[in-house]
């Protein structure tokens, strides 16, 4: 059975929760062994896949995990707003470190490497691809290229103001277009995650609400202030 078929079966049997194990950069939790522990805990609690940033984190997580790993590398570039897996060598490094699925910024913004070249390199390694998109048009374009997973990852993050609520309308439109949608971005409660599934998402990625202790503590701290 192919990886995609196994993942489809897992989503059908266990639900579509993907956990993004990305600690706050530079925080006490930002250590590969802690990321690996997070990933194992997420998988033991029902996550069908995890999303891991960085080669050292991925190498540390891989031996301890049987569920698929979505691998990314984040970079801050001077000549492009694209941050997620912008280079071909990033794809190579993620593949060598054990990623099953490679996600990359698929927005229609200026970029060092075009989407087709990134996809070709992912296919060269025999891996699945996830397009992190900011608009419906981007998602449909990537779906037409044969990219397996279309994420709403960048919706609300390419403009000056980030909305509070997730983009459920984007989920619905991409689902109606036939995409295998991974809802991602501001799904910080179980109710919002359930709403994404109700709106047609194939799976939902949750990050901060599960793995970023600083964010969660701030939510509670602000709530109890007098």
From Swiss-Prot:
Gene3D superfamilies: Aldolase class I (3.20.20.70)
Coiled-coil parts of chain: none
Signal peptide: none
Record-level Gene Ontology MF annotations: N-acylglucosamine-6-phosphate 2-epimerase activity
Reaction(s) catalysed by this chain's protein: an N-acyl-D-glucosamine 6-phosphate = an N-acyl-D-mannosamine 6-phosphate
EC number: 5.1.3.9
Keyword check for Metal-binding: no
Record has Isomerase as a keyword: yes
GO BP field: carbohydrate metabolic process; N-acetylmannosamine catabolic process; N-acetylneuraminate catabolic process
Cited InterPro entries: Aldolase_TIM, NanE, RibuloseP-bd_barrel
This protein's pathway: Amino-sugar metabolism; N-acetylneuraminate degradation; D-fructose 6-phosphate from N-acetylneuraminate: step 3/5
A Pfam family it matches: NanE
UniProt keywords, alphabetically: Carbohydrate metabolism, Isomerase
Listed GO CC annotations: cytosol
Family: Belongs to the NanE family.
Role according to the record: Converts N-acetylmannosamine-6-phosphate (ManNAc-6-P) to N-acetylglucosamine-6-phosphate (GlcNAc-6-P).
HAMAP family, per database record: ManNAc6P_epimer (MF_01235)
Protein's name in the database: Putative N-acetylmannosamine-6-phosphate 2-epimerase
